[in-house]
Amino acid sequence: MVTYKDAGVDIYKEDKVIRALASQIKFERTDAIKPADLKGHYAGAIEFGDYYLVLCTDGVGSKMVVAEMANKFDTVPIDMIAMNVNDAICIGAEPVALVDYMAVEDITEDIASQIGKGLNDGIKESNINLIGGETASLPNMIKGVDLAGTVLAVVKKDEIVSGKEVKPGNVIVGLRSSGIHSNGLSLARKVFFEISNLDVKSKLSHGKTVAEELLTPTKIYVKPVLEMIKQVNVKGLAHITGGGFRKLKRLNKDVCYKIDELPEILPIFKEIQNLGNVADQEMFKTFNMGIGFCVIVEKDDAEKIIEISNHHNIAAFVIGKIEESVEVNGETKRETVLVEYNNKKMIME
């Protein structure tokens, strides 16, 4: 069975590397401009009067490799923006501005124009301004193009959604993803291009080509989630990216997140699993599996969350609940994420 690690990505090693880096960051300002207590969350924030200024930074990873193979660059900028703004809204902040960074080996005017179109589409959907950026020509350092960005968002101090209010009895509403989004591309590429000897133009069993599936842009959840925050007492918000539902542990770590009512898995994930003989647990540790964002609320508020999401043409479902503990193989587990799928109980560590 092929794994994400076989494809060159070790998420546990990445966790250790991040901890090693963070352990050396000890300096903090001592004046009134102080960081919010959000370590380990989706975004960082600093105090600014009655507000927090929120910053997120991210890129598109190896999705750009597929863009180069297909010579199609107009969707990956949407992915870059989505990865940033979807993280910012996880603490209830409204994204307002973006700066981008593009590193290139060489680039044509046509590719630049495609990237520009994608940037415009992404900022329009997110309702943010692109206020600057940097393009670096680095022919001796990289091959192709890499694209990243940083988003500024704002939230009133008394309106921040930290996830600390998540408690047993709450329910988890999952918002549909558009597909693979921007995580797990290394494993997907290994399955399609190495194991199955397909190319970007190859048709998959459900009719779409490999390029169409892998280059479908990440769903931007800004508008529906900001509306939800205004209308409902939201307890926690989670962008489901690398590591899958493990991301829920960024919220309240003292509870169990039980995912036991998942909707139909999207075709792209079935293709990857079948062609690569990928285990269920590996799939759920690597991909979003059709749920790109989670909203945690009181049970009575779930219907309103689903209504708002549907109004924005995003399907939504109650996919689970918060519990004090869960039972797995006769053992009581606490402070964890449990996914029940295909008659299996899988702990997402």
Curated annotation (Swiss-Prot):
Instruction: Alphabetically list the UniProt keywords.
Output: ATP-binding, Cytoplasm, Ligase, Nucleotide-binding, Purine biosynthesis
Q: Which Pfam family is an annotated match for this chain, by its short name?
A: AIRS
Q: Where is the major localization of this protein?
A: cytoplasm
- Which terms in the Gene Ontology molecular function aspect does this entry carry? ATP binding; phosphoribosylamine-glycine ligase activity; phosphoribosylformylglycinamidine cyclo-ligase activity
The annotated pathway is: Purine metabolism; IMP biosynthesis via de novo pathway; 5-amino-1-(5-phospho-D-ribosyl)imidazole from N(2)-formyl-N(1)-(5-phospho-D-ribosyl)glycinamide: step 2/2
**Name this protein carries in UniProt:** Phosphoribosylformylglycinamidine cyclo-ligase
PANTHER family (alphabetical): TRIFUNCTIONAL PURINE BIOSYNTHETIC PROTEIN ADENOSINE-3, TRIFUNCTIONAL PURINE BIOSYNTHETIC PROTEIN ADENOSINE-3-RELATED
InterPro entries referenced in this protein's UniProt entry, alphabetically: PurM-like_C_dom (IPR010918), PurM-like_C_sf (IPR036676), PurM-like_N (IPR016188), PurM-like_N_sf (IPR036921), PurM_cligase (IPR004733)
Q: What is the lineage of its organism?
A: Archaea, Methanobacteriati, Methanobacteriota, Methanomada group, Methanococci
Q: Which GO terms describe its biological process?
A: 'de novo' IMP biosynthetic process; adenine biosynthetic process
- What organism does the record attribute this protein to? Methanococcus maripaludis (strain C7 / ATCC BAA-1331)
One CC-aspect GO term: cytosol
Q: Which EC numbers characterise this protein's activity in its record?
A: 6.3.3.1
Gene3D superfamilies (alphabetical): PurM-like C-terminal domain, PurM-like, N-terminal domain
Whichever gene encodes this chain, its name is purM
* Enzymatic reactions: 2-formamido-N(1)-(5-O-phospho-beta-D-ribosyl)acetamidine + ATP = 5-amino-1-(5-phospho-beta-D-ribosyl)imidazole + ADP + phosphate + H(+)
Similarity field: Belongs to the AIR synthase family.
Q: Where in the cell is it found?
A: Cytoplasm
